[in-house]
C-alpha cells in the first residue's frame, strides 16, 4: 500500500510522515531537502534555477515511486510527484520564473512519467493558512527558507486547493493543520489516525 502526504511548504508533511510511520510500522520515504543540490540556489535566484530544480524533483520522486512500489511494503511518502507538476511548476511559469519553453519541456517529461506509475492508494492533504505556514517555517529555521515570500506561499496555497478539489485518481483525506497540532498534542494525532483508519479500511 502507498500512502502519500501532500501540502505546502511548512505544512508538516515530514513530521506527520514520521509520526504515522512510527504508529503503523510503515516504511517512511522522506523528501530530503538538505541534500538537494539546487534548493539553496533556487531560493536565491528562482528564475535561473527553477527548471533545474523541478526536473531534479521529478527524477527523484519517480525513482522513489518505483522503489516503493517494488518493495512490497506499506510505504508512506513525504510529498507526491503530482504536486510539482500541478502546483510548483505552473506557479513558477505564471510568475515569470520559468520560461514557456522550459515549462512545456518539463510537462512533457511529467506526462510521460505519470503514465508509467500508479497513483498513491491514499493522499492526505495538510491544509494550512499562510500564517500557520510562516510560523512553522520560522520554527524549523532552515536558512535557505528565510527568503520565501508571503505572496509565493499564498499562490501555492491557492493552487493546492484547486488541485486537491479536482484530484480524482485515488482516495483522499484533508487534515486542517490550523486546528490540529499533531506534532505536540497526542489527542490531535489520534484524530488524524482515526480518520486515516476510516480511509484505509475502505481500501480493502
Task: Spell out what each predicted region is.
Residues 16-17:
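Post-Walker A alpha-helix
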Residues 13:
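Conserved lysine of the Walker
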Residues 5:
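Hydrophobic anchor at the beta1->P-loop junction of P-loop NTPases
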Residues 87-161:
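A glycine- and Lys/Arg-enriched "phosphate-lid" helix/loop adjacent to the NTP-binding pocket
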Residues 134-204:
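NTP-dependent small-molecule kinase module
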Residues 49, 53-118:
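Glycine-rich phosphate-binding loop used to anchor ATP phosphates in small-molecule kinases
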Residues 22-60:
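Conserved substrate/cofactor phosphate-moiety recognition/catalytic segment
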Residues 8:
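P-loop (Walker A) phosphate-binding loop of NTP-binding proteins
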Amino acid at each position: 500500500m502507498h500512502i502519500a502526504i501532500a501540502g505546502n511548504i511548512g505544512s508538516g508533511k515530514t513530521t506527520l510522515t514520521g509520526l504515522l510511520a512510527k504508529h503503523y510500522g510503515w516504511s517512511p520515504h522522506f523528501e530530503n531537502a538538505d541534500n538537494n543540490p539546487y534548493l539553496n540556489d533556487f531560493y536565491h535566484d528562482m528564475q535561473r534555477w527553477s527548471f533545474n530544480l523541478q526536473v531534479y524533483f521529478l527524477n527523484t520522486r519517480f525513482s522513489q515511486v518505483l522503489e516503493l512500489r517494488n518493495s512490497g511494503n506499506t510505504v508512506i511518502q513525504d510529498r507526491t510527484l503530482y504536486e510539482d507538476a500541478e502546483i510548483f511548476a505552473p506557479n513558477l511559469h505564471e510568475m515569470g520564473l520559468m520560461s514557456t519553453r522550459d515549462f512545456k519541456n518539463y510537462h512533457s517529461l511529467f506526462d510521460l512519467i505519470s503514465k508509467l506509475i500508479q497513483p498513491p492508494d491514499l493522499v492526505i492533504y495538510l491544509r494550512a493558512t499562510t500564517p500557520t505556514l510562516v510560523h512553522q517555517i520560522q520554527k524549523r529555521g532552515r536558512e535557505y527558507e528565510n527568503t520565501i515570500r508571503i505572496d509565493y506561499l499564498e499562490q501555492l496555497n491557492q493552487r493546492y486547493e484547486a488541485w486537491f478539489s479536482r484530484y480524482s485518481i485515488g482516495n483522499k483525506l484533508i487534515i486542517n493543520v490550523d486546528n490540529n497540532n499533531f506534532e505536540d498534542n497526542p489527542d490531535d494525532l489520534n484524530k488524524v489516525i482515526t480518520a486515516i483508519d476510516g480511509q484505509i479500511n475502505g481500501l480493502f
